């Protein structure tokens, strides 16, 4: 016979598994459609027209039209494609289901069009909204927060291909003063995260790790080097934090999302021309290309980091539907490679992992997620103690500092102005 605690944990197990599978399938379908549209826009269509896919006119044209298309979706779709991600945390309150079709279309257009944002925020919003809406009908006695936690855990597992990230994140959010043990509260979310991760693994494997030279033994000087690298990444990230609300306010003075996103897409196109095709899109595949290209110099890595960070700020400020974590990881990789090229005595494993830790910490203000991203991009167990130590001064630097989010004015409606 199972203990009553075990029976309590099992109550939400089946819904948790179902939510994890559904969260992954929604992500997979969206990414497959976006990939097909991306191939059409950036491979087949320019080839048919006899235009180079890295032609400045093509890059500017596609991104400008992408901005206009996303603006039209936000302007005319029911619910205006959900809330502006620049004003929302990664895990937020459920939105009305009527806003989801527009949000999905806006996300697919942005991913395919080369916008420097990832899928994490919109996918999270979609999955939370569906889980709350369907769960409230099927099991009305379960509160909305439980459905929100299960959906967000399933989505995190699906996004990263492992339940580890969900375990780390929810170990801090669910660790309250309740007498219920932490792992009792983590049981159902981890079931959802595991189901999401395993389902994603059936179709594709998220590839985060980079082919960076193995790091052997930690030295005391490496801790200082890592802390300096993280501080540099934090400084770069805080420039973006300062710019985002100001640019967002300036762009939204125009009130018309079609105009705002059209201009935003045009600016992204110019940045894409300067940075080249590797500076476009969400950044995960592109950072693999960046590491594989042995011809890049210190100045090239610096340019890519600056361009990607600027594109991230412009895309978020313009109202494109997307997340900021994946492009931030690209910025961290570019910064890390630049610093290694500048000071070869510091191993690339340290510069890249600590730069990722610093920039993701600025974007998410989540220590566990920052450690996780640094550890999966540069998978080396020798680095883990160093990263944990480097996290301490990095966290001190950011204590009390503003987050990479825009405070929504009180008079502004729940969704974008139209």
Curated annotation (Swiss-Prot):
It is found in: Cell membrane. Its main location: membrane. InterPro entries: Chloride_channel_YfeO, Cl-channel_core, ClC, ClC-type_chloride_channel. Signal peptide: none annotated. Gene3D superfamilies: Clc chloride channel. One of its GO terms (molecular function) is monoatomic ion channel activity. The chain crosses the membrane at residues 10-30, 54-74, 99-119, 120-140, 149-169, 186-206, 223-243, 258-278, 300-320, 322-342, 343-363, 371-391. It is a multi-pass membrane protein. GO terms for cellular component: plasma membrane. Keywords: Cell membrane, Ion channel, Ion transport, Membrane, Transmembrane, Transmembrane helix, Transport. Belongs to the chloride channel (TC 2.A.49) family. This is Putative ion-transport protein YfeO. The lineage of its organism: Bacteria, Pseudomonadati, Pseudomonadota, Gammaproteobacteria, Enterobacterales.
């Amino acid at each position: 016979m199972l203990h009553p605690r075990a029976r309590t944990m099992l109550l939400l197990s089946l819904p948790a598994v179902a939510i994890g599978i559904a969260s992954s399938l929604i992500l997979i379908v969206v990414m497959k459609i976006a990939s097909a549209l991306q191939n059409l826009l950036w491979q087949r269509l320019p080839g048919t027209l006899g235009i180079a896919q890295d032609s400045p006119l093509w890059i500017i044209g596609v991104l400008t039209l992408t901005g206009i298309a996303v603006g039209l979706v936000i302007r005319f779709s029911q619910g205006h494609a959900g809330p502006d991600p620049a004003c929302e945390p990664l895990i937020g309150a459920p939105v009305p289901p009527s806003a989801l079709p527009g949000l999905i279309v806006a996300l697919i257009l942005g991913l395919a069009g080369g916008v420097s944002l990832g899928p994490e925020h919109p996918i999270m919003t979609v999955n939370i909204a569906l889980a709350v809406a369907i769960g409230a009908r099927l099991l009305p006695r379960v509160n909305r927060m439980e459905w929100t936690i299960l959906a967000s855990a399933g989505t995190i597992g699906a996004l990263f291909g492992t339940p580890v990230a969900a375990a780390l994140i929810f170990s801090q959010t669910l660790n309250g003063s309740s007498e219920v043990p932490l792992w009792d509260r983590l049981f159902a979310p981890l079931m959802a995260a595991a189901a999401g991760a395993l389902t994603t693994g059936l179709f594709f494997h998220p590839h985060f790790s980079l082919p960076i030279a193995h790091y052997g033994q930690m030295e005391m000087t490496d801790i200082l080097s890592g802390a300096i690298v993280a501080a540099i990444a934090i400084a770069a990230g805080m420039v973006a934090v300062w710019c985002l609300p100001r640019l967002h306010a300036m762009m939204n003075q125009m009130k018309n999302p079609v105009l705002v996103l059209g201009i935003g897409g045009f600016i992204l196109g110019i940045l894409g021309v300067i940075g080249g095709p590797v500076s476009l899109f969400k950044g995960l595949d592109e950072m693999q290309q960046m590491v594989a290209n042995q011809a890049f110099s210190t100045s090239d890595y610096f340019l890519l980091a600056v361009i990607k960070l600027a594109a991230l700020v412009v895309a978020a400020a313009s109202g494109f539907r997307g997340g900021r974590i994946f492009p931030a990881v690209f910025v961290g990789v570019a910064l890390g490679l630049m610093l290694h090229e500048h000071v070869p005595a510091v191993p690339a494993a340290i510069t890249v992992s600590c730069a990722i830790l610093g920039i993701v910490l600025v974007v998410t203000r989540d220590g566990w997620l920052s450690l996780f991203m640094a550890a999966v991009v540069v998978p080396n167990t020798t680095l883990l103690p160093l990263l944990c130590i480097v996290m301490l001064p990095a966290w001190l630097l950011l204590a009390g500092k503003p987050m990479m989010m825009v405070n929504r004015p009180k008079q502004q409606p729940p969704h974008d102005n139209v």
